[in-house]
Curated annotation (Swiss-Prot):
Record: residues binding ATP: 48-55, 172-175, 201, 209-212
Organism the protein comes from: Trichormus variabilis (strain ATCC 29413 / PCC 7937) (Anabaena variabilis)
InterPro entries: Cyt_trans-like, Cytidylate_kin, Cytidylate_kinase_dom, P-loop_NTPase, Pantoate_ligase, Pantoate_ligase/cytidylate_kin, Pantoate_ligase_C, Rossmann-like_a/b/a_fold
A Pfam family reported for this protein in Swiss-Prot or TrEMBL: Pantoate_ligase
Reaction(s) catalysed by this chain's protein: (R)-pantoate + beta-alanine + ATP = (R)-pantothenate + AMP + diphosphate + H(+); CMP + ATP = CDP + ADP; dCMP + ATP = dCDP + ADP
Annotated spans, Cytidylate kinase: 303-534
The name this protein goes by in its record: Bifunctional pantoate ligase/cytidylate kinase
Active-site residues annotated for this sequence: 55 (proton donor)
Binding site for beta-alanine: 79
Annotated keywords: ATP-binding, Cytoplasm, Kinase, Ligase, Multifunctional enzyme, Nucleotide-binding, Pantothenate biosynthesis, Transferase
A single cellular component GO annotation: cytosol
Protein encoded by which gene: panC/cmk
Amino acid sequence: MRLLTTVAALRCYLNKRRWESQLTASEEQILDSMTSWYQTAIGLVPTMGSLHQGHLSLIERARHENSTVIVSIFINPLQFGPNEDYGRYPRTLEQDRQLCEQAGVDAIFAPSPEELGIPQKNIQESQVTQVIPPSVMISGLCGHSRLGHFQGVATIVTKLLNLVQPDRAYFGQKDGQQLAVIKRLVADLNLPVEIVACPTVREASGLACSSRNQYLTAPEKQQAAVLYRGLLQAEAAFKAGVRYSSRLREVVRQELAKVSSVLVEYIELVEPTTLMPLDKIQEEGMLAIAARLGSTRLIDNTILRDRQPIIAIDGPAGAGKSTVARQVATKLGLVYLDTGAMYRAVTWLVLQQGIAIDDDCAIAELANNCKIELTPSQDLQSPVRVWINDTDVTQDIRTIEVTSQVSAIAAQAAVREALVKQQQRWGKRGGLVAEGRDIGTHVFPDAEVKIFLTASVGERARRRQQDFQKQGQPEVSLEQLEKDIAERDWKDSTRKVSPLQKAADAVELQTDGLSISDVASQIVDYYQQRLSQW
């Protein structure tokens, strides 16, 4: 692991990593014609140091999803107010270095403020070029008492994204306002990076992990856990049918009042993306708290969603995801969202229009301008009916020609971005079963039930051969199908964009020797078990 403290060293390191990836790709391409896909993604975990379990969970996620992981450690003077704790904020670089090395980080970027051209002054006094988020997003919640804080955050995050140019950057959901601001910043400035939101990590008491928890004594930590208990009370009220902000906030206030040493700064209900205040939850809301315990400021939040559950089913090609997902949706009365059919439809259109598979620009235009419609079939033996640009392609997208090219199309960032947006719009109200390769990790990371279906290559080849026979497709040998499936697995799991992965909180089902009905029944049982816990 490298410790980098200058911009020049960081750029040199990143250039070297990218060159090594390209060199490895070229060598592998000569050795094996199937290795035309490479996981060269860079993941960035921005921190202010004093690392804790929350940071380590971000690093673990980044390590799982990227070939190179960079952790930045920078205590940003721009985001501290004149009377805040910039001077006493914990500085533990050697300890942080050891934790990063143990976690498999490739490099730490720990510059001084001067190295980044930032004077050690707050944002109001600084002459540095600033990034200013929309005022409506930074005037409420923490922005009300921390003037200039989010301008400072936005400025340094933009700097880091520009310097590292990561494919993904990881932030915790505990800082809900910061997360929303950064997502908006990336969208508004068209920055080519995916912002990955990771769940809040908590201590045993429920207190959200924070570097500032070091300021608290052991008794104070127990007292501070009342914030989480207040959120739990609100979640219980929400599940019981309470939707109005005034009532939900009062539930939290009553719980916090039980600990007199906790001084409430705010309890607010806002829309999680825009941060606009909500009177009533129609779809989802973020219930956020800020309070002080002695000289320590604490924040926490929870997302309240008024939607039916989502079941995310991931797994490799030929694992039976589509058939299982349809049966599960039928048994539970949910909508079946065949995301694989969407990618197949785009692939069919690419081939139909004679566009080269590697013409990313033309395919990006096509994916962002096409119209896809899915209509469930009442007959479980028949596939979902699929239209693209008003053409019925239900049968056409299942041909060997489309099957052999769909992974290449699905791996293109512009295609996935266009289709994921549409899938997420469909999933806004929940009540659906979706299957694919990154549903639980990327499309619906907040799905209530996550399943990872898998089977041996031989079993999947046998199933695929039976499918082709039923569809009247030309005969393909098991040996060829096994080779094709192994190649598809490799491509899907090593591609740079949204690779095939098992979500950390997914249940894995090995389906060799099980019928479709057996697998569907297991998922339904698990769903009902989870439902009883909500």
